């Protein structure tokens, strides 16, 4: 099974692709879609959709896992919600089933503790995927954790 994990945002969308065969999981790709803050929000969303389409065409995931947010009062909230909408729409266009997980569930599934620190989650991601180097940037590592959660919570 191939899973695309996504950590949505308007400035940076983290992504991670994992493949599971015979119970063994491995990372195929990870990175970020970074948009330029000088561009309009609409142009940034078009860029996210285009880059996500490219990733889907390359890796052909069977499932997508997206980090689910619980927002607090923040001026950035609307931008993240809009970027998430672009992600959901793009996945729907490709008919890719999607699951969502809140941060605490991701931490619990991957690190074994719902209040795990970022470095504990990163260590768990590295261990689960047999990585020698930590995935960078953090958004990509977070997306891999989301993808792993989809596999571990199946």
From Swiss-Prot:
It is an enzyme of class 3 (hydrolase). Its cofactor is Mg(2+). Mg(2+) 1 binds at residues 7, 139. GO terms for molecular function: crossover junction DNA endonuclease activity; DNA binding; magnesium ion binding. InterPro entries: RNaseH-like_sf, RNaseH_sf, X-over_junc_endoDNase_Mg_BS, X-over_junc_endoDNase_RuvC. Keywords: Cytoplasm, DNA damage, DNA recombination, DNA repair, DNA-binding, Endonuclease, Hydrolase, Magnesium, Metal-binding, Nuclease. It catalyses: Endonucleolytic cleavage at a junction such as a reciprocal single-stranded crossover between two homologous DNA duplexes (Holliday junction). GO terms for cellular component: cytoplasm; Holliday junction resolvase complex. Its EC number is 3.1.21.10. It is found in: Cytoplasm. The active site is at 7, 67, 139. Mg(2+) 2 binds at residue 67. Binds 2 Mg(2+) ion per subunit. One of its GO terms (biological process) is DNA repair. Transmembrane segments: none annotated. Disulfide bonds: none annotated. Its main location: cytoplasm. Belongs to the RuvC family. PANTHER family: CROSSOVER JUNCTION ENDODEOXYRIBONUCLEASE RUVC (PTHR30194:SF3). Homodimer which binds Holliday junction (HJ) DNA. The HJ becomes 2-fold symmetrical on binding to RuvC with unstacked arms; it has a different conformation from HJ DNA in complex with RuvA. In the full resolvosome a probable DNA-RuvA(4)-RuvB(12)-RuvC(2) complex forms which resolves the HJ. The RuvA-RuvB-RuvC complex processes Holliday junction (HJ) DNA during genetic recombination and DNA repair. Endonuclease that resolves HJ intermediates. Cleaves cruciform DNA by making single-stranded nicks across the HJ at symmetrical positions within the homologous arms, yielding a 5'-phosphate and a 3'-hydroxyl group; requires a central core of homology in the junction. The consensus cleavage sequence is 5'-(A/T)TT(C/G)-3'. Cleavage occurs on the 3'-side of the TT dinucleotide at the point of strand exchange. This is Crossover junction endodeoxyribonuclease RuvC. The lineage of its organism: Bacteria, Bacillati, Cyanobacteriota, Cyanophyceae, Synechococcales.
